[in-house]
């Protein structure tokens, strides 16, 4: 009898513990969203779009690391989201935050789903996804040359709206049309006119954020410290950015683009080496990036370098400038094409001549591919022999990639403490490393990831040091990750200072004020510092 009593008592304890710590179900979350407490601000609670779990997306989440099988998370196994929330109003975002707090689940906010490690749609802990796809309005004011952009908009949607409104305006941001504005801006935002106008985050003049209590703040009510943190510090650590107000950039009606491709070899190595010394020092109107990749010619792999260029002016200005600063490239007028700024976006996406409406396609991503990426900053020209070794290593892979993005210009004129993005003066260019593959198997993944890590290790002597810099928007969990809600600030320094250098401490202090319980967190979020 005593044994039976003990058994029943232990069973009771187990059931109690299970009830306390069990993961909330989809139905529980829906019930929370449907209660009067959370629906008081809605005119018609029955029509809540938050009660959706897209079956296609849900299936893909269970089979891969992203909604479109384009991104790979290498460092942790994801749980399926309890719910994919697709709010149609800001009040529904508030409901999602409050219910998540009540039920003890994390919130992952997804703007475009391009986080390189999947942190906008993956988690080790029980979580929901707040997909901002329905909140993507764009309001342009040409009088003061600004735009209010909701975080669910993609860069392609923003560019299309600008182009339909003005022939002489642009926005200083990236070239990938399907990238979401929310994450891109909050991580910095490289682009083809950044040497003239700075990063996307440098052009933010106001923002609206929903905090952990569901309160909406703008620049005035959030204060300058939090506004500073959002512009390059990764907004997902602080709340849900609802919208950004950005400065538009003036561009000429006609810009000039050209592509110059060459097989890698001694002469090409000299060209790339020469570019390193001048890319960041050229006229601010001139952006020349270098892409190193390979292709199959017959049964043989060939490594090539491509100089991809945008000039904010005509051919008649560009040719003399190139002859003076970079005559080694041998640029001719017939190599160049004049076009509108919006056409240059198509050009950089290898889609010249296609309808502009393709920019509105939110699914323009790598097709059926997985990848691993890393980044670096170069402060002194890399020796020529390094490119010889890179060429040898590229011949081992089907789809390796290195992209050199020139810095300098406006980027270097901004203090490294003016925003969380610190990689300013003294940096010649950024390197993005990437390797892609199609077979979704562990052995295949490990083979390519080992290759990527080996290349990154090889480059160690030639890139920035103390700390070795990295770019947040090319997120890399190899740098380190948090250990849940109780991760110490000191533990996070290893990767935090890699992205933010000395700004990491200030980000922690801001986090401690706006989100002291660390509700908004992921595997590389900012821990609170008090």
Curated annotation (Swiss-Prot):
Q: Where in the cell is it found?
A: Secreted, Cell wall
Q: What is its EC number?
A: 1.1.1.-
Any signal peptide, and if so, which residues? 1-22
Q: What is known about its processing and modification?
A: The FAD cofactor is bound via a bicovalent 6-S-cysteinyl, 8alpha-N1-histidyl FAD linkage.
Q: Give the top-level enzyme category.
A: oxidoreductase
**Cross-link 6-(S-cysteinyl)-8alpha-(pros-histidyl)-FAD (His-Cys), where in sequence:** 114-176
The free-text cofactor remark is: Binds 1 FAD per subunit in a bicovalent manner.
Tissues showing expression: Accumulates in cell walls of etiolated hypocotyls.
Name the record gives this protein: Berberine bridge enzyme-like 22
Which species does this protein come from?
Arabidopsis thaliana (Mouse-ear cress)
